[in-house]
């Protein structure tokens, strides 16, 4: 059966990670780990989403009047993501489909923990690209993915990771920007290396701590 695959890269914030929340610029680079979403039509009357990497498994659902009606009980991360995409991005079709979301490259091969390289944003962008109603247009994908991201984050976060996953490369970004981010050239002779600490971080809690510090200052 014919299928289509869509991928989006992870990211690493080089500077401005929390200052960007207050309107300062951030510099972010796309990485070669990618989230992949594969879509294929189903002859059955229900859709199914399968995940590889995060919360591995398969769960059935239907799209009714633009909303997800779950027939199984997926993990909250899977449920909230698909719900947010269906509620905030115009869907290309409500016909039954099989979705496979693969984020395996965002997890440590040693202890299976998340590496903190933007898997959630990369998955959001790839899923929006796979399901949105418009033709494959990067700016419409960005606009819809930002809406999904805001819904998932309760309006918090800068959106720099969404922008990086959409446009790739090395970018300079401000959270107040409505135009696409500025592409930046990597300096000649400058090299970088990332190291995995072995400890996961909660992005939402980190944003809340940063907000608390800025209020005190």
Predicted regions and their residues:
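C-terminal nucleotide
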Residues: 1-15, 19-20, 28-29, 34-93, ...
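DPxDG-like acidic metal-binding loop motif
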Residues: 115-137
């Amino acid at each position: 059966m014919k299928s289509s695959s869509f991928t989006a890269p992870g990211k690493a914030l080089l500077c401005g990670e929390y200052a960007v929340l207050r309107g300062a610029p951030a510099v972010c680079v796309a990485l070669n780990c990618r989230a992949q979403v594969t879509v294929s039509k189903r002859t059955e009357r229900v859709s199914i989403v399968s995940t590889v990497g995060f919360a591995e498994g398969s769960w059935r659902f239907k799209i009714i009047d633009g909303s997800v009606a779950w027939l199984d009980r997926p993990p909250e991360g899977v449920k909230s993501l698909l719900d947010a995409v269906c509620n905030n991005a115009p869907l290309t079709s409500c016909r039954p489909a099989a979705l496979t979301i693969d984020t395996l490259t965002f997890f440590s091969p040693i202890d299976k923990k998340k590496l903190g390289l933007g898997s959630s944003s990369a998955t959001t962008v790839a899923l929006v690209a796979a399901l949105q109603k418009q033709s494959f247009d990067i700016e419409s994908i960005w606009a819809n993915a930002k809406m999904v991201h805001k819904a998932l984050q309760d309006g918090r976060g800068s959106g720099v990771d969404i922008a990086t996953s959409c446009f790739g490369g090395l970018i300079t970004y401000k959270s107040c920007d409505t135009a696409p981010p500025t592409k930046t050239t990597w300096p000649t002779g400058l090299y970088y290396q990332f190291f995995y600490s072995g400890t996961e971080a909660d992005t939402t809690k980190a944003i809340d701590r940063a907000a608390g510090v800025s209020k005190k200052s």
